[in-house]
Amino acid sequence: VERADTTARLIGVEAGNRVWAWRPNVAGVSEVLHAEWRDHTYPAHTHDTWTVLLVDDGLIGYQLDRRGHAAVPHTGVTVLPPHVVHDGRPASSHGFRKRVVYLDGDVFPESLIGSAVDAPLILDGQLRRESSALDRALVHGDDLEAQSRLALVVERVAWHLTGRPELAVARPPAGVAGRARELLDADPGGVTGIADVAAAVGVSSAHLIRSFTRTYGIPPHRYLIGRRLDLARQRLLAGEAPVEVATATGFYDQAHLTRHFRQLLATTPGRYQRGTT
């Protein structure tokens, strides 16, 4: 996986074992770790964070609060609570490959720790897809998308840890999606996060994402990127330098603008500005 150059760093290669780790600029996310471990066994320890673990290959055996468990590939998400002792070891001959997102300890209430200890493996395809999408957004440094994905992951995990209660069909306040769109349109480059927009219209981030997507067929973070690209194109055609356009329209830097520009238009900002492909 190509990791964002400004965030990821390879912190260890030894005897076929590799580890990448970085701290993204996303509220609620403490650290991201990717590991390819062939024969590494790690001793009993604790974290002050919640662990969202995706196994992509192999099998991990571990003890959590002195009870044996396994983290399985492809189908499940393992959620380990903070302050609870656990270890880990390869349970397959070729080792394992995993992706881990560590969430701040206050992302979930302490009352859910016991449920996570009792059943850390969550077999939920939707949660697996959302967690993987969160990891990809963090890899690429897409903070807006990561914020949105995180909101959905947190909501889904909490639903499982509270016993999967029947979801009440609550009508959102009238016009949530429309009011959110007005806020995004008013200052696309100045929006700092989806959570702020959700708070402004009086709903949770996950609620806003669902309502907006249902209304417009696109999640709010993707809509916002599109609006920022519209502004960037206008400024580029007016002759502004790409590096200045990037920061003026809400992108972190020119590389961030270029990546989204390529996704939409299959060319770079500089070539677009020059009228070449």
PLM feature segments, named:
Residues W37-R38, L161-V169, I209-Y216:
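Short, Lys/Arg-enriched N-terminal segment that forms or immediately precedes the first helix
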Residues P173-R181, I225-L229:
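Short, leucine-enriched amphipathic alpha-helices that occur as contiguous helical runs
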Residues E110-V169:
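Amphipathic alpha-helical segments enriched in hydrophobic/aromatic residues interleaved with Lys/Arg
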Residues R18-A116:
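N-terminal regulatory/effector-sensing and dimerization cores
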Residues D56, R128-V139, R181, D185-P188, ...:
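Regular secondary-structure segments
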Residues D185, G190-D230, L237, A246-G275:
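Basic/polar phosphate-binding segments, predominantly the helix-turn-helix DNA-binding elements
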Residues V1-N25, R274-T277:
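Actinobacteria-biased recognition of intrinsically disordered, low-complexity terminal regions
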